[in-house]
Regions:
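Charged DNA-binding/catalytic regions of mobile-element recombinases
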Residues: 1-159
């Protein structure tokens, strides 16, 4: 696992319902470390996502977690969780989406390869396909910059 992670939130609108996806992505290999899908973009969404990610790493790893300046990333509880785990917080400059381009790129791929290519019969169908997509993205989707390996294969080969 790398020492730089990024996070952000993106919105999906389907069947008159909004869903919000919040992933943590490892910049080392592009792997989605953890994620949370919610009907509301609230603090619990990002703290649950953090707890899932924290279960995969030891304390004090000298990790940096980068985000935009969204309200949830400025919340004291979120910042306290990072500090207690020994993770340094990094935030984009105000109004500069390019600072979080890696997260935005993942969202673009996700929407291009899943959302815009499939017909969904229900919100539940979309949710199921989203979980499958992230599993496929991590374990099967090859990347040229990873020598033709998937993110998980690249991490395992490097270990």
């Amino acid at each position: 696992m790398g020492n730089k992670w990024v996070t952000d939130v993106t919105e999906f609108a389907l069947f008159g319902i909004k869903l919000y996806l919040s992933p943590i992505i490892d910049l080392y290999n592009g792997e989605v470390i953890s994620y949370n899908l919610s009907r509301h973009p609230n603090l619990n969404q990002v703290t649950d996502m953090l707890e899932k990610a924290f279960s995969k790493i030891p304390d004090n790893t000298n990790l940096i977690l980068h985000s935009d300046q969204g309200w949830q990333y400025q919340h004291k509880h979120y910042q306290k969780m990072l500090k207690e785990k020994g993770i340094r917080q990094s935030m984009s400059r105000k109004g500069n989406c390019l600072d979080n381009a890696c997260a935005e790129n993942f969202f673009s791929l996700l929407k291009t390869e899943l959302l815009y290519l499939q017909e969904f019969t229900s919100v539940e169908h979309f949710i199921s396909e989203l979980h499958e997509y992230i599993e496929w993205y991590n374990n099967k989707r090859i990347k040229l910059k990873l020598n033709g390996l998937s993110p998980v294969e690249f991490r395992q080969e490097a270990a």
